[in-house]
Amino acid sequence: MREITPPLPAGDLIDSPRLMLRDGTVASVRASTPADRDAIRRFFHDLSPESLRNRFFTSSQPSASVIDRMSDSTDPAQALTLIVHRLLSDDLRPVAIASYMAVNSRVAEVAFAVGDVFQRRGVSTALLERLAVSASRQGFQRFQASTFADNHAMLEVFRDSGFEIRSKTDAGVVELQLSLTMSPEGVRSSEERDRIASAASLAPMLTPSAVAVIGVSRESAGLGRRVFDALRAGGFKGPIYPVNPLAADIDGVPCLPSARELPPGTDLAVIAVPAPLVLAAVDDCAAAGVKSLVVISAGFAEAGDTGRALQHTLVERVRNHGMRMVGPNCMGVLNATANVRMNASFSPVVPAPGRVSLLSQSGALGIAIIELARERQVGLSTFVSVGNKADVSGNDLLQYWERDPDTDVILLYLESFGNPRRFARLARRIARSKPIVAVKAGRTTAGVRAAGSHTAALAASDVAVNALFQQSGVIRADTIDEMFDIAACLESQPLPAGARVAIVTNAGGPGILAVDACVAAGLQMADFSPATTARLQAFLPPEANIGNPVDMIASAGPDEYRRTVEAVLTADEVDALIVIYTPVDRRTSAETHAAIAQGIGAGRRAGSVGKPVLSCVIAEPGARAPMLVDYPSAFDPDLVVHERVPSYGFPENAARALGRVTAYAAWRAQPPALYWTFDDLRVDEARDLCRAVVDARGGTWLTGEETRRVLNAFGLPLLPTVLARTADDAAALASMFG
């Protein structure tokens, strides 16, 4: 057994045609073909003499044989050339070319050339990582490279790459040897570069300086008009430009006849025109320098083969222009933070600002989710309806939210995974600092079919999804409502240090329900110490149950609630508290609520600031609104803490939410897993078998024999196993084993 380096981010993206640049723009990347000869020749012809010299050690153009070799990537065991393309003056051209060519079976020579305008954008670094992953898969162990000693930019790429490097300088030329195994520090640097580029690409979309809406009609019911009206009503801080060639103005705001006339600095354009007109709108936006798009229009991959082909063309066009796109077939994006206040969607509801960010793959559900957030008083930071996820996906948004100062909790409504391996790697890292709560729809066969027709989603096995979430630290919620139950706890309460929970109630029935739900959720009922028991006995009536749950009985008034909550919250043997209140006399409800808040505040002042508190108010209007608790800080008496205690309509909801949060806290407390391997594993054999099963039968269970072969490939010892098809067969076979 030996520890190995975790995989490079480029390994998750090796087949992706999108290349992220450091400045937040994107480009297309693919392996060369013989049809690229003329484009490659033209690329080198347009390079400056200095760039040619740095690539070929001469300012002369490369020979035809060199061009031919770069144009042939049919056998990556011999050579591979990656070409980066962008649309320049409506012409798709190479802007960077990187190659490796075999020296022998273990060593390949690597070289790069980047167009002068695209240098210093991280292109060479990204291409080096992709080439390294591809070369490793072909059995290469090292790259070798040569560069002039004064080519500081290229030397910086190699030295900052994270690969182990040996170098020597002779006559002004540096000869380098790069191991294709990256150090853990190098992997972390690579992940950070990937995160920075992804976040930079989404900043113009989520924090734009100005927004255009393409397809704003005079009719108030049109989607473009609804987005335009929502932007104005939401209080967006920057200019809003409606685009309509047939209208002079919309509600007094002058219209532009074409997106090509948008002024500089228009970061985001929302496109709401019929699907056949979207490509032209994209080209117009690119000509005006727009950096990001939200395509609300439907009629793409969710609409059949013709729409799927149109979506493929759309994504290529957007990528070749260097832009990012949400959608198509989405409801828009929203940023509720005070300094942005952008509702670039057709949601009629603007949520209160908060610290929860949300992704929804369904537009219609997105509207309901925003309304539920308002009802539950869970404030949102950003909301993105990704629709068909043709470009921007949940993985991109996770990296944006990872360091977003306005996001503490991440919520996901998913119908599919585009790249589950990448999701697992990102979620495992991000969940260490910010909780991720997900609802994954399509749990049944019928649900999978519905998801596919709804947003062109490719659903995954529910068993696989559970395993993915558990390993990645993602909190899975079964319903949207449960997702908000969990979010309400996470956004306002500390993570528990353990699973010991105490329950305070004034009615036995709800207390019993709470106990059952807590145990089912994996929580432990705290055993009160003699000190805690004595403290409760000092003021509670003899009829009260001093155990856990603490049943103060129906006659308990505000004072009993205040003192009991404080006593239990400050008990060392308690990690979390659920307070249940069943209004027996509504005339004292307000006073009792205040007393519970006072008890929580007293417990906080006494030092119990690290314990989550959840409340449950039964059969009372507004029961799910958070309880507001104000108290002087335990660290600074002049500072008043304003705490929101989540409230639930039934004890089971509170218990389930606390159980999910406690399990997440336990996962987060564990040290990050190390990557281990064994030299005698036959991973390729197991992988090939599983792929053959998927190709033959789709996502399904392995047979007994297939399972045995997979486990055997991983060196796991198996007991003798036989298959019984009837109860009598099982009894007969069991007798054979004693």
Short names for language-model regions:
Residues R2-P204:
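Long, contiguous binding/interaction regions
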Residues S183-G738:
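Catalytic-core regions of core metabolic enzymes
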